[in-house]
């Protein structure tokens, strides 16, 4: 937990805004369309085996950077070894390896879930997916690996009941999380078209 007198917590969903870019939209549309075009070209130019290898490499990159942001990072070499079930004899390094592997496996699970999503419905940008992602990640970890430095055990798929700090960042007050989720669910499902969707994915 954090010490409330020493932190300024977000308690209102207006602090969440803007959920979508409000300026230079024309330029952003050009950029997002180019991303879509290049992605389509890449998918069509790679052999399926190569494409799968690229996806797995990107998963490892996602795991490395996401966990590093949260102060749980480990060396990419440690991640590669962990994927081969070769864990360090150092407890802290091994724990970070397990977190990295759980992150990668959770991403695979969620990708499979969204493989057949009709993107005009933007189901993958709802708060339900955030909760499912939380469950998919932390549900793969033993209790000791889900225990914060303050001794709080993170419950997979549950909205927290304490105020916390993630790395150097004070998270929104726990009592306001549902309001933030509600604002998210009121915004992103209204997006229409590939250009808006890609902007929404980046913003979310």
Q: Where on the chain are the PLM-derived regions?
A:
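FIC/Doc superfamily catalytic core
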Residues: 1-204
